Regions:
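N-terminal, intrinsically disordered, polar/charged segments of Gram-positive cell-envelope systems
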Residues: 20-56
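C-terminal motif of bacterial Sec signal peptides marking the signal peptidase cleavage site
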Residues: 15-18
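Active-site acidic/histidine clusters and adjacent loop/turn architecture
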Residues: 62-127
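Positively charged n-region of N-terminal signal peptides that target proteins for export
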Residues: 1-5
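Structured segments of extracytoplasmic/periplasmic soluble domains
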Residues: 73-75, 93-109, 138, 160-163, ...
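Residues that flank catalytic or metal-binding motifs in active/ligand-binding sites
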Residues: 66-68, 131, 150-153, 199, ...
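Mid-length scaffold segments of soluble, non-membrane domains
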Residues: 110-111, 125-160
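Catalytic cores and adjacent binding grooves of peptidoglycan-active enzymes
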Residues: 140-143, 158-238
Length: 238
């Protein structure tokens, strides 16, 4: 009887050990779950400490409560999955989260999605590093109106390869300054946004306008909510 009991105990122990080993192997082999990795939150105290005095400047007039933090996944040019984070206005948070999810599922390459605060809210440094971002508070030059990035209602994607450019008094303005090689929009190069691009299609389907369609200047990286809609949301910002 005692011998049979020991056999049962040993068998049970072996079974539990096998189960534990199986669970550990499964956990070690797991990859990021897209459903679990795409989420949003309010601007917590911890997040606020990261942006205070940088993208959320001391003179920021936009309530902290109007912003949302997004956690996403994206794929780089090598097909590697990366984690990303972005801050946008609550009015567009669900749309942007869905757009970035669809881009990830399509393996659309985005090199970096980091808060601009990693660059001390310096747009030029962020763009030169080909970083994709959204919220960065600032007023429109010589006005008291907040810019669309300052409201968190504009998103820039793959910024080095999709620069901003304008001719002023016969001279070309280029941002970032290191993007001259990507001014020729007929050339073939990675990360380029045009009318056939999935990024363009998804953002415009969600009601955004593309800076590449502007006539007086071109901002190929830039997607924004139309001014008329913003005036409804923020009538005081006129």
């Amino acid at each position: 009887m005692r011998k049979k009991l020991w056999i049962v105990v040993i068998a049970a122990a072996l079974l539990c050990s096998a189960c534990a080993k199986s669970d550990t192997t499964k956990a070690d082999a797991s990859k990021p779950d897209a459903d679990d990795s795409f989420w949003m939150s309010d601007i917590t105290d911890e997040i606020f400490e990261r942006i205070k005095g940088k993208s959320f400047k001391d003179d920021c007039t936009l309530p902290r409560e109007d912003l949302r933090y997004l956690h996403v996944l994206h794929v780089d040019l090598n097909g590697e999955t990366r984690e990303g984070e972005m801050i946008v206005n609550y009015h567009i948070a669900e749309d942007v989260l869905e757009i970035l999810r669809q881009l990830y599922e399509a393996k659309y390459p985005i090199e970096k999605i980091r808060l601009v605060d990693k660059y001390d809210a310096d747009d030029e440094r962020s763009m030169e590093d080909n970083n994709s971002s959204a919220f960065n508070f600032r007023f429109i030059s010589h006005t008291t109106r907040v810019s669309k990035h300052g409201l968190g209602l504009a998103v820039d994607i793959n910024t080095l390869y999709n620069p901003y450019t304008k001719i002023v008094d016969g001279e070309r303005i280029l941002e970032p300054i290191t993007a001259e090689a990507y001014l020729d929009r007929d050339a073939d190069f990675p990360y380029k946004i045009d009318h056939e691009d999935l990024c363009f299609k998804l953002f415009t389907e969600h009601g955004f306008e593309w800076g590449g369609d502007w006539e007086d200047r071109k901002d190929y990286q830039h997607f924004e909510i139309p001014t008329a809609q913003i005036e409804e949301w923020y009538p005081e910002n006129q």
